[in-house]
A protein has these predicted regions:
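Hydrophobic/aromatic-lined pockets within catalytic cores
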Residues: 26, 30-37, 49, 110-114, ...
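N-terminal leader/targeting and assembly helices and adjacent pre-domain segments
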Residues: 1-117, 121, 216-254
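Acidic, glycine-rich two-metal-ion catalytic cores of nucleic acid-processing enzymes
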Residues: 128-228
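Short alpha-helical "recognition helix" segments of helix-turn-helix
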Residues: 122, 126
Length: 254
């Protein structure tokens, strides 16, 4: 009877410790989420302004004409930040990611403590999960940065009264099939829609845009491409689309 009571007390202590650990994990993941959201918002705001003014400068330099431009309105910046372009605001995605991570961490801790798993094995499993959490965080930030950069550039086209833009995909073998299809397609600025005809079209999207002022303006422009074998970059004509590049530099060379 005494041994059974001692075992019961030990089991009860283990459960109490487990619940405390699970609560600590949840609280810390949410604290991390708050930090990520606050830092990301500042980063995104700075990137919006930088993309807007840099693109205005590039447009004027390309045209060879300097003219006064308006400051980017605060309400436009807020609109870009608040836009649920992918169906869910980035802050909600951060909270979702940390919810998933917290649950996975709790499962590792629960199964480890209840089964008597070694601390080294548990530490390894926890490390793998936090590495994945870091990857998910980086993927979200990279994708959102692509969105706000391209959204800010659209605003710069409006400021310059440019009514069309051209979709620019990356010329290498990592480019997604959807971005390959959109490469060098021309769209109306007023109908730009992130995830549809404006990058990003998917997570880790590397596509961008440039002002479209007619085909003749592309004659003197070069595009960068990456050699599939060496990884080195080289220049191709600005009017060359992804399909043409693939046929000439991948299929024919292969």
């Amino acid at each position: 009877y005494m041994m059974a009571q001692l075992n019961a007390e030990a089991y009860k202590a283990r459960i109490t410790r487990l619940e405390a650990l699970k609560e600590s994990v949840y609280i810390n993941t949410k604290l991390a989420a708050d930090v990520e959201i606050n830092q990301s918002t500042k980063l995104y705001t700075d990137n919006i302004k930088r993309a807007y003014y840099t693109n205005l400068f590039d447009i004027q330099q390309g045209l060879g004409v300097g003219f006064n431009v308006a400051q980017m309105p605060v309400d436009v910046i807020q609109e870009i930040l608040k836009n649920n372009w992918s169906g869910k605001h980035f802050s909600k995605r951060v909270w979702h990611n940390t919810d998933v991570l917290a649950k996975q961490l709790e499962e590792v801790i629960t199964s480890g403590l209840m089964s008597g798993k070694s601390s080294r094995r548990m530490a390894q499993e926890l490390r793998e999960l936090t590495d994945y959490g870091k990857f998910a965080c980086e993927r979200l930030i990279r994708t959102e940065t692509t969105y706000i950069t391209n959204a800010a550039e659209i605003e710069s086209y409006k400021e310059c009264r440019i009514d069309r833009y051209i979709f620019i995909a990356t010329l290498d073998l990592r480019t997604s099939s959807v971005c390959r299809e959109h490469d060098r397609e021309v769209y109306e600025v007023e109908k730009a829609e992130a995830g549809v005809n404006l990058p990003p079209l998917h997570p880790h999207c590397r596509s961008t845009t440039r002002a479209y002022l007619g085909e003749s303006t592309l004659n003197d422009i070069k595009r960068r491409a990456r050699d599939p074998e060496t990884g080195k970059t080289y220049l191709v004509p600005g009017e060359m689309a992804y399909k043409q590049w693939y046929e000439k530099f991948v299929v024919q060379k292969g």
